[in-house]
Regions:
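An N-terminal-biased, well-structured beta-alpha scaffold segment characteristic
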Residues: 1-103
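Phosphate-binding beta-alpha-beta segment of Rossmann-like dinucleotide-binding domains, i.e.
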Residues: 98, 106-139
């Protein structure tokens, strides 16, 4: 179970998976956290167990699945950051039982969704779907 710890910043280990934005690493570095491992992809369960066992914090997106088995082997884990909308990739009951808080970024896609809506409005106003269909039919 995660304990209340007071660790020096240079001893706190971050495991960041799935190509998180470079700003995350800049913010951590500026705050004095330099023990940050950045892996651009999700890991298979065996690799994840090996990497997470010494991590205090893990940052993930939607491809990494933190099961009860994985969380129980993460003895030093203090918190889980889901840098995505949901937390369904984390066994929340196991995290709660182990005293590991889980947080997410529920509005991380807001700007992208707004941009897409505006682009689709413009596309519909200009009749692009109809014109596209005509071109594909050879007309």
């Amino acid at each position: 179970m995660a304990q209340n710890l007071s660790l020096e910043k240079d001893k706190i280990r971050f495991l960041m998976l799935e190509g998180l934005h470079d700003n995350a690493f800049k913010v951590l570095s500026e705050a004095g956290y330099h023990n940050v491992e950045n892996i651009k992809t999700a890991l298979d369960p065996e690799e994840l167990i090996e990497k997470i066992k010494d991590a205090h914090f893990i940052g993930i997106r939607s491809r990494t699945h933190l099961t009860r088995d994985i969380l129980e082997k993460a003895e030093k884990l203090i918190a889980i950051g889901c840098f995505c909308i949901g937390t369904n990739q984390v066994d929340l009951e196991a995290a709660r039982e182990l005293g590991i808080p889980v947080f997410n970024a529920p509005y991380s896609n807001t700007r992208s969704v707004a941009e897409l809506v505006l682009a689709e409005i413009i596309m519909l106003m200009r009749g692009i779907p109809e014109k596209n269909a005509v071109v594909h039919r050879g007309g």
